[in-house]
Structure formats: C-alpha cells, structure tokens
C-alpha cells in the first residue's frame, strides 16, 4: 500500500512539473504554474519524510526542465541538455525537503518564501546561476505580472507560490488560510494593473541575430 501511495505521489510530482512548464512561452498559460505548484504541495500532504520530500522535489524539477530546456540540445547536443536538466532538478531537492518540513509543522505560509530562496540560489550560483525556469517568467499575461515593478521577479514568484499554496490548502486545511493566500495576491495584482493604466497598449516586433556560432558542441561558447 505504501509503495502504491509513493508511486501516486511521484506521478503527481511529475505532472506538477509538466503543468508548470505549460505556463512558459510559447504556450504561456499562466494559471498552469499555480495549478502545478499546488499539485506539488499536495504531494507533501498530510506529511512525508524529508527523504521522500526530496525525491518528490527532484521528480518535479526533472520533469519541468526536461520539457523546458530541449532548445539547449540544438546547440550543445542531447547529453549536455539532459545533464543540465538533471543539475537544475537537484535544486528542487531542497524545495521538496524543506516543503516536507514546513508541511509537517503546518508552516504553510513559509513555503513560498522557502521556494523563492532556493530559486534565488539557483539563479545566482554557481557561475552566475541559471535563471531559466523562474516561476515568475510564466506569469506574463496574468494579473501577478503587475507586481513586478514593486518587487521584481522575486515578488511575482512569491505571489505565485502563495496562490499555489492557497489552492492546495483549499483542498486540505486550514481552508481559511488557503483562501487568503489564493485571493490576496491575485487581488493585489489586479489592483496594480489598474493603477498602472491597464494592460497592453500595443505590440513591438524585435529581431536579433547571433553570428559566428557555426557548429554544435560545448566549445561554441569559446568562439568570438
């Protein structure tokens, strides 16, 4: 029975990663990030060990980055692409392990802060970090994007994770806290959009050309 439950948790964790991927361009369905992270937080309910939480985090991250980063394989080949996806997924181990602790202690409000702390580390270390996959990048077109002028992508990520945690808690307990975490960030984003004069006012087409990268392989970055 325990193996079946673990298998179910792993399946949901993988699905949560795919859901978060759907929020990024070119698909750009911003609610998918909220749904995906809510599914991931539900994987940790009612409580799991730190080891299981770490495993769930890795599966979530691996499914996300395998879908998000195939374009890298076009430049450096499939092996480096998979290696990068695995490396980035290692950071999600911390998300899952910490999330398991917070779920067990019912410190649900702290999960968004913990997630963004790990996201910051991944985006800055090592070698300047790798910021692809920040949860904020998937909120283009949604109300939470209007929070960016007040706190940058970190605030947008916190707001997204707050909504996700709130959605998960609406299916668990405490439902009142869940409703607050879900509604307040969306309301603030909506208010910020009104204060800034609404949505899009036009479109701009931009083209860029990168020259002198004629071949595949990791040495492409050495060319000038």
Residue ranges: model-predicted function:
Residues 2-197:
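Membrane-embedded alpha-helical bundles of multi-pass enzymes
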Residues 194-224:
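Soluble catalytic regions of membrane-associated enzymes that act on cell-envelope
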